[in-house]
Amino acid sequence: MAESPEEPTFQRLGPVNWLPEERKLVERYETEIVELRRRLEIAEAKAAYAGWKLEATQAKRTFKLGEAIGSKSPGKVLEAVRSKSRAPKAPMPVTEAVELANHRPPLVEVPKAKWPLGPVNRPDLRVAVILDDFSRMAFKYEWDQIEFGLKDWPEIFADKRPDLLFCESAWHGNQGRWRYQMTGTNAPKEPLRDLVAWCRAEGIPTVFWNKEDPPNFDFFIDTAKLFDYVFTCDGDMVPKYREVLGHDRVDVLQFAAQPRVHNPIQQKQGRLHDVVFAGMYFRDKHPERREQMETVLDPVRELGLHIFARNGEVDDKYGWPEKYRPHIVGELPYDQMLAAYRMYKVFLNVNSVLDSPTMCARRVFELSACATPVVSGWSRAIEETFGDLVPIAREPVESYNQVLHLINSPELRARMGHLAMREVFDKHLFSHRVDQILQMLGRPTQLRSRSISVVLPTNRASQIEHAISSVAKQIHRPLQLIMVLHGLDIDPVVVADKARMAGITDVTVLPAAPELSLGACMNLGIAAAEGELIAKMDDDNLYGEHYLSDLVRAFDYSDAELVGKGAHYAYFEGRNTTMLRLPGLEHRYSFLVQGGTFLGTAEMFRSYGFPDLTRGEDTHLVRRLKEDGVKIYSADRFNFVYWRSADAAMHTWQADHIKLTRNAQFSFAGRPDDHVLI
């Protein structure tokens, strides 16, 4: 929140972080809605049955004859005798309708997530692809993607020559245009052979990725033999590929997340629901997966488990056992599943492949990128890839206890989700996978780190070392510090040397006259900034080492020009307590972010600048951005603490404790370092 003397508007807590009494109220309303819906369905069934009885009676010849006699019209009597009206079709019996209403699963409304348009990460890299839908939609943000069919590729390639051919183990391929070309009788089929042969003749490298290993190795190995380079999702299969293919151009390529669609941006309603599983049931295949369902899913049914799956008209071998059917809330297409990822507090995962060091469901990467906690059955890949970031349930009681604990622990959920998200954004994005491919080909990879200039004004000599330490500890690089000495009679060279000794190599220290406003000091720093992004940091607040590296990620998935923290922790030194302020403003677009957490594009800061004010300068900037429709994004709550000194005179905003805590939750007594600076 931009700290200013102005009255902040009221902001209700939740639904991101419900207070217990609010959660109980919501649950009561949800129960009442279910009961009203049940009664309505029964009433509608009775009305439909009564209507049918009336129509059926009116359609009978005896009814029409009696009506005609009553009218004393010979013509109508004759017409009634000759009439052959069909009786209307009977509706569902009321008893069946009541039974159905009593056992209907909960109603879950899931919006469709939008696939954003916009730039790709490597517009100068043209890649022709044959991919199934999930990979096709994820990779399209990474390069200039060329999609084609069996017959039109020569014409397309003549107009747009690819730098690389990248194919995965596709069942349908490019929306069905390459269906069954890699598997089945006589596979790989001639069109695929011709395509790869043409690329080889033209000097275009060809890459194949088997995402179906290890169970479907035999289905795709003959296709893999056509390609120059081969990747597998299972690290244990690399030696076998090298043996069969006769070369060592083989490596591992795990699944990944695409931040443009797999990100923590909340739907308006937040995480309304508790726990969910999404997937199919296999009666005859994958016995390990079925066993994990009994371990992971079955004990959680009494916690209000939802299941997204097909129900009703499915083959018996894919039909869910009876005990799970009341929990099935419908089947979701992928664009709705993306929204569902951010509507639940906990997602469950089970595994078909247990012993691979690298092969696990892509959904675990996607959910973690959404900061959604996952509880999973055991697999070697999940254990080695995510460690304790994904809790493992080996016994039913472990599943029950872990899910219940997460449902009841909003602070733990936020912390666990944040750390898992960081792991994926650091190591497991599709950008990382493209880097792996390019490295295998001996081609240069892309530097993704944005340069940041930190503008940090201070008018307190006693805070200079703390301010330098806050910036020096940041793991993000490249990093520039621009410190503005506001009315301080200190040699800028001495301050710059201190910053360099702390490990900051790019330092500029500017003197500023004491009569200048804080806004004017910020503008001095902005004018000297060289970074792609500019951060405003304060000299007294606490910043964790991951503060900037976490915050800058919002530019990978949001359309914001300014990001910051609406939800944030505040430490009240005089009371030795830590509060979570504005908990509902986390992972969502907002016009309320804390002034000490501003991180924006250099272009935006130079276009708008700060007003010539000492108090409320950040609030006025935010208001101008709002008026002009410039998007502001409020990220996570971690790695920043608004420090409220016991001496109120230390702050430009002279607000009392009650005003500062009225939109806050009490978190704990004591300092926040261990919990917040992670």
Give the location of each predicted region.
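Conserved donor NDP-sugar-binding/catalytic core segment of glycosyltransferases
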Residues: 546-577
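C-terminal catalytic/acceptor-binding lobe
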Residues: 418, 608-678
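Glycine-rich, basic loop-to-helix element that forms the pyrophosphate-binding segment
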Residues: 512-529
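Boundary detector for helix-to-coil junctions that initiate low-complexity/charged tails
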Residues: 1-104
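Short, acidic, metal-binding catalytic loop of nucleotide-sugar glycosyltransferases
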Residues: 469-478
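Nucleotide-sugar donor-binding catalytic core of glycosyltransferases
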Residues: 96-160, 169-172, 176-178, 184-191, ...
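A charged, aromatic-enriched C-terminal amphipathic alpha-helix characteristic of glycosyltransferases
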Residues: 411-441
